[in-house]
A protein has these predicted regions:
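Conserved helix/coil segment N-terminal to the catalytic DExD/H
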Residues: 171-203, 214-223, 389
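Conserved RecA-like P-loop NTPase helicase motor core
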Residues: 357-457
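Conserved nucleic-acid-binding Ia/Ib motif block in the N-terminal RecA-like helicase ATPase lobe
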Residues: 135, 139-191
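Walker A/P-loop
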Residues: 113-137, 142
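Conserved helicase ATPase core of P-loop NTP-dependent helicases/translocases
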Residues: 152, 166-178, 328, 338-339, ...
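Conserved interdomain hinge at the start of the Helicase C-terminal
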Residues: 293-343
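Conserved pre-motif I regulatory segment
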Residues: 54-55, 73-76, 80-119
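Post-DEXD/H (motif II) to motif III coupling segment of the RecA-like Helicase ATP-binding lobe
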Residues: 210-277, 454
Length: 462
């Protein structure tokens, strides 16, 4: 048996034991299939499972991260190993990236590990640590992200320490490879002929790496890119290495397990403590959210709550009562965000923006970027956005008010959302998160679940 470790791990003439392991460990239930089936939708063209391995003739091909998990089995056989990794000339970045003690320790641990995931709380400086990691490795690096906003934030941060002549970007359909670090969106890179990039980079760093397993689409895009790169070092950065649908295993198989966790205590003096204020809406369970058998349809429930006029007016009252603060209003429904925005008084509306995932055109991206920049600069005070965008690294330190307009239960969403207002900023008021809780048992249970997440984030008032 022969094992070739390159962009992927190829095992020639695998035994039945190895094939059985692949079927057991590298085939995941497709959450899209399960969701459609649960909602009674047609599932004809949706695969029931997602496979992380391939069979090619007498060989089985696995993601590189899976090698560690299967190695104990390989060790019981006579195996010949061969490595075919990228080996480019060293890069002298001539950069001194400032780090706190806990960041120094995190970078050291990741250097020693050589691959894997760095888990660090929101506001702890993951981007700073990632850039320091790339500089200390002194190798050609690909920085991979899933949004233009994150790419710009990371590029701007790197340019503070590294000469721009060493930096490049692959985004919006344009390819400009840097001699040092190239910042790329997975959407653009996945559309390229990836065979030409197989040995281009020695290091890949995936920002917000839990998004690798975000959806079957994003999993396919990230998997396609990462599995085509023969990088010796594959790293991931994330505040929440967690997914409610169990898809996080995909992330481990592509990048490796969590190698270092920055404890919450280490960053307590670097982030602000968020106060949680429960706001009882008095809204009973909507009849339209019940299926014929009396069970609650979650999708219908969220839509109905988002459309409740009296509920939205209550949220609007809380928003308008503090116009001097900097508000982030989050919802699962764009209709609700626009309803709230449209009912702002004219002078207040001039200080507000709505951003959503549909702003993908050149003009839309520019408007979204401008809205975020205006919030950063203090020119605007109200930002309406989806929970999804809040998970995608909204870096606006002056935010001090958070409104959860629709109920959430996912740990990663809560942690990321609260983290948006926990950043330190000169002259910033005590950050407050307003949690709007409705008047029925399921809503109260979801609030109790959120309270557990809040406590893990160091919040108080609960």
């Amino acid at each position: 048996m022969k094992v070739i470790i390159s962009n992927e791990t190829t095992i020639t003439e695998p035994t039945q034991e190895i094939l059985e392991w692949c079927k057991r460990e590298l085939v995941l239930p497709n959450p899209d299939y399960e969701k459609k089936e649960r909602m009674g939708l047609w599932v004809g063209n949706t695969p029931r499972t997602l496979s992380l391995y391939k069979v090619n003739g007498n060989s089985v091909i696995l993601p590189v991260g899976a090698f560690k998990f299967i190695k104990p089995i390989l060790n019981t056989y006579d195996v010949k190993y061969e490595q075919k990794m990228a080996k480019n000339e060293p890069i002298f970045y001539d950069a001194k990236v400032n780090l706190y003690d806990y960041q120094e320790e995190a970078v050291k641990q990741m250097l020693d590990a050589g691959y894997g995931i760095l888990q660090s709380p929101a506001g702890s400086g993951k981007t700073q640590m990632g850039i320091a990691l790339a500089v200390k490795l002194g190798k050609k690096c690909l920085w991979l992200t899933h949004t233009q906003d994150l790419l710009k934030q990371s590029y701007d941060r790197a340019s503070r320490y590294i000469d721009k002549s060493l930096l490049g970007t692959i985004t919006a359909g344009k390819v400009n490879i840097g001699t040092g670090i190239t910042f790329a969106t997975v959407q653009t890179l996945s559309k390229q002929d990836l065979t030409q990039y197989k040995y281009m980079w020695d290091v890949v760093i995936v920002d917000e790496c839990h998004r690798v397993a975000g959806t079957p689409t994003s999993m396919t895009q990230f998997s396609k890119v990462i599995s085509n790169l023969a990088c010796r070092h594959k790293y991931g950065l994330s505040a929440t290495v967690h997914r409610a649908d169990g898809m996080i295993k995909c992330c481990y198989m592509l990048l490796g397990e969590v190698k270092h966790i920055v404890p919450e205590e280490a960053v307590k003096d670097k982030v602000m403590q968020v106060k949680i204020e429960k706001v009882n809406t008095g809204v009973d369970i909507p009849f339209v959210a019940l299926d014929t058998d009396g069970t609650i349809n979650y999708t219908k429930l969220i839509t109905s709550l988002a459309n409740k006029v009296n509920r939205n007016d209550d949220i609007l009252m809380h928003i308008l009562s503090q116009p001097e603060h900097y508000h982030l209003i989050l919802s699962d429904r764009l209709d609700q965000l626009y309803y709230l925005y449209d009912r702002l008084p004219a002078p207040i509306k001039e200080l507000a923006s709505v951003i959503d995932g549909k702003m993908t055109s050149k003009k839309g991206k520019a408007e979204r970027e401008q809205a975020i920049e205006d919030m950063r600069a203090g020119k605007k005070h109200f930002l309406f956005a989806s929970y999804k965008l809040a998970k995608e690294g909204l870096d606006i330190p002056r935010l001090d008010r958070l409104h959860l307009a629709t109920p959430q239960k996912d740990y990663a969403v809560i942690v990321q959302s609260v983290g948006r207002i926990a950043r330190t900023f000169e002259g910033k008021a005590q950050p407050i998160c307003y949690d709007y809780v409705d008047n029925f048992k399921m809503a109260e249970n979801m609030y109790k679940q959120r309270c557990r997440h809040y406590r893990k984030c160091g919040c108080y008032g609960i």
